[in-house]
């Protein structure tokens, strides 16, 4: 073997000794990428429906609800009344003459009815009526009578 041929062999060996680490890294990256590609095709291959647009195409119209709050007692009774309106906001009326009533109409799917009253006589009552049906009624007979009516879902 001549020196020239032996010199080429040594230079290739020197070249491989310098670039073997980058070559191993390149092979590991290629093999790792292929493994991830294959595993991804097994475990995440189903196409799921997007729920980004959840608007219903057609909503059925419904009749508005009518809610009536009533507070009653002996003639001349004055009461302090608290209630939730159609938007569930608390309202208060001080010194209301009885009988007292309030009619609310709403298109909400559900409404919570809450009515509280305290009068200056020994008897007071309340009633919540939803679409003509009495859903809650209570009468209290005591000194400075206090009563409440509650409908969780009207």
Swiss-Prot record:
It is found in: Cell membrane. Gene3D superfamilies: MmpS1-5, C-terminal soluble domain. The chain crosses the membrane at residues 19-39, 97-117. Keywords: Cell membrane, Membrane, Transmembrane, Transmembrane helix. Pfam families: Mycobact_memb. It is a multi-pass membrane protein. One of its GO terms (cellular component) is plasma membrane. The keyword Transmembrane applies. Its main location: membrane. Belongs to the MmpS family. This is Probable transport accessory protein MmpS4. It comes from Mycobacterium leprae (strain TN). The lineage of its organism: Bacteria, Bacillati, Actinomycetota, Actinomycetes, Mycobacteriales.
């Amino acid at each position: 073997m001549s020196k020239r041929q032996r010199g080429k062999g040594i230079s290739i060996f020197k070249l491989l000794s310098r670039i073997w680490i980058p070559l191993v890294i390149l092979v590991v990256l290629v093999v790792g990428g292929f493994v991830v590609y294959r595993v991804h095709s097994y475990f995440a291959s189903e196409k799921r429906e997007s729920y980004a647009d959840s608007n219903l195409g057609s909503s059925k119209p419904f009749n508005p609800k009518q809610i009536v709050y009533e507070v009653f007692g002996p003639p001349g009774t004055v009461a302090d009344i608290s209630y939730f309106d159609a938007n569930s906001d608390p309202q208060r009326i001080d010194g209301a003459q009885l009988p007292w009533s309030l009619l609310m109409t709403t298109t909400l799917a559900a409404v919570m009815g809450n009515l509280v009253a305290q009068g200056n006589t020994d008897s007071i009552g309340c009633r919540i009526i939803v679409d003509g049906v009495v859903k809650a009624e209570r009468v209290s007979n005591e000194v400075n009578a206090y009563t409440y009516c509650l409908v969780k879902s009207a």
